[in-house]
UniProtKB/Swiss-Prot annotation:
Similarity comment text for this entry: Belongs to the LCL2 family.
Keywords noted in UniProt: Signal
CDD domains in alphabetical order: LCL2-like (cd23996)
Protein name in UniProt: Long chronological lifespan protein 2
Described function: Probable component of the endoplasmic reticulum-associated degradation (ERAD) pathway.
S-S bonds: none
InterPro entries listed in its UniProt record: LCL2
Amino acid sequence: MIAHLIVALLAMPVQSFFFDFGGHQAQQQTQQTTSYEDSVLNSDCKGYVCPYTNECSRGPEECSCPFPRSQLRCVLPNKQVVCISKPATNDKKLNDVYDDTAKGPRARNKGVRDCGWVEAAYKGLV
């Protein structure tokens, strides 16, 4: 009986470590973070603050995508920018095109959801 009690007492720190019964995780979550609104309002940017990256630019058409390694930056006919996931393909040549920041957004491949597909959808052709 006493042996079981000792084992239970020795196991409590391990349980606390894995399951955070001490409530330390909740304390970490209460740290104050700067809101998106505050970061935009307190920006030194004299131009346009891009909504997803908070970078300063001359206008929305210059904003980059938040995840450029996995997204294509498509510019619509009205100059708005839409970020889409790069097409998933096993074709190395196509992957190289989509990984190129200049060629990727201009690629128009039939049957692939790339910037060409986005433009067609914008025009109501899809």
